[in-house]
Amino acid sequence: MTGRSSSATEAESALGEELSYLLTLSRPRFWLYLAGPVLVGVAYAAASVGELVTPATVALFAYFLVPANVFLYGINDIYDREIDAENPKKADREARYRGQRYVPAAVGLCAALPLLFAPLLSTAAWPWLVAFLILGAAYSAPPVRFKTTPILDSVSNGLYVTPGIAAYAAVAAIQPPLLAIAGGWLWAMGMHTFSAVPDIEPDREAGIRTTATVLGEGRTYAYCGACWLASAAAFGALDYRLGALMLVYPALVAAIAVANVAVDRAYWWFPAINTVVGALLTMGGLWRVAHG
């Protein structure tokens, strides 16, 4: 009995360690980067309070909160194993993949999960789920590996707004306005490229070319500012209040550049900033639902 009990305890401990690693791999600080757009999309697509919480919207939010992040960052860590060995960011707030066999299995499972809830969604949402999975894989995995191709690494990261587009389409059964898609895509391009600034030196040492390594820190800030200004313009064409809110991003990157703030510090501010901006966007959509 003692032997069996010990084996069971060891198995439970191992399972706990594996789940803990997968949670760390999924970047909890960034969970709302995928799940947040779902809330925004639902808030602006709903025609009534009853459309806000449905099996479809709950399934989308739950998937993009954790499993989608395991899928996205798991693929990234698997194919960046050698590069990450030299990246100091991995030793601090993230985890280094060391070849654990359960990680590819977990990534595959998370990629397949949308098959379970796709029947709950309008068919208008399906292409955006497929786009997320394809772009998420192609960004890190060969032979495409967008992350090593300047500009394409930035453009492909529009994948971060596909959850919101899918949510809008799932609720409204139509696609969101093209200006909203363009504004969101441009925001994601700027956000991705800004987040690559702390990796400039490790990527250069590893021989990886990205938009950030080609431009260098100063011009990368300018690129991000241009993306975010264009995003604000697109949203402003829909509603001036949306455009005004999105101006916070070019203002922030300009302040960081002028004040010479260390990007390693500024990088970790953005999850909180994005959460606040996303909450304001969502509240605006909910106000529309409640008050017309």
Task: List where the protein language model places each region.
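Multi-pass alpha-helical membrane architecture of UbiA-family
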Residues: 1-292
